[in-house]
Amino acid sequence: MVGIESFKVMIAPTWVPDRRNAERMLVATLQSHVSNRLSLPDPAVPGQALAQADTPSLVLDLDVFEANLGLMQQWADRHGLALRPHAKAHKCPEIARRQLALGARGICCQKVSEALPFLDAGIRDIHISNEVVGPAKLALLAQLALRADVSVCVDNMSNLHALAAAVAQVGARITVLVEVDVGQGRCGVTDDHDVLALARAAEAMQGLRFGGLQAYHGAMQHVRSHAERAAMSAQAAIRAAGYASLLRAYGITCERITGGGTGSAEFDAASGVYTELQAGSYAFMDADYGANEWSDTLSFGTSLFLLSTVMSTPAPERVVLDAGLKSTTIECGLPRIQGRPGLVYAAANDEHGVVRVQDGAQAPALGEVLKLVVPHVDPCFNLHDTLVTYRDDTVVGLWPIAARGLSR
């Protein structure tokens, strides 16, 4: 759209007597455009019934959420570990603030860009629990390190040199954690020589400080059997302890051994190997974690739901919801309908969720609002701008999911 000043320049050479009239007409046109522009309202208003919220909306039961936060913090405190919750789970600074207020040491982010809204929110202890490769990302990481206490993972000598060059260029300082593969089969070194070489190099390079090891095993988090997860956690801890012992044998201090997740926190904390836990989903839970076996020692409630409205009732055995693939991901299975036995979320399309009504179940009415347990918390948060919080089915507030879409 042409601005007023640009329009003045365009009409200046001609029609001089009519310039003021033309400017007035343009201003009136612009004002009309602004006044007629439609803005998307917030999905909910504090004080209203949760069922009146617009859908699809991501909603958080504050009572269950706060209980989950307290339980994990108490578990970490009991075992003398720091809790560094993973912000990739929620991408919401307001959630991180509450975790820090309960005693969390800092946060994890998976990407450098993801950390920026948390920096803006005043959070100053950030671990990038990933390798950062490429000039643009390293330059941004160096700028982040000028403004916060930042650590990052490295598993490659070439990347370590590039990191050192980036921080040296701006005079920053960053802590390096060597990532070791403790069974995940993803990133991380496995050779003792590589672990030792990277730690020594990090100690020697200007602007870098060797801080310890990243030893995360994501694959075990969703192993259904409680006993199998315990065994896998024990093996991962043995590997991590072995690498730490190697470094200490060569006179290298290993301050931090960071890792662990929601599915393994019970065992990781009790292992005596880790110094901090990186769990994130514990605050919310999802259908995938809900399928795990849990002990009474450490189990969490479901606090996060996707609110969805019945938009069509085409057949007695089938209704259609307004929440599909653009509201939830399905790589970990389909959503589960909360509190409505006999209703099965059977298929997801872009903007439709097809629900099968089993024999004997009561079909929901057109316009009825249902709660869905999402299959996988992390990517679901990334699909939404706002988190609606509530207590006793009454809306309390709206929290921006400020880091959604920040995956660079």
Each predicted region: which residue ranges?
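Active-site loop ensemble at the mouth of alpha/beta enzyme cores that anchors a bound cofactor
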Residues: 229-231, 264-341
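C-terminal accessory subdomain/extension
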Residues: 313-408
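Active-site loop/helix belt of alpha/beta enzymes
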Residues: 175, 181-294
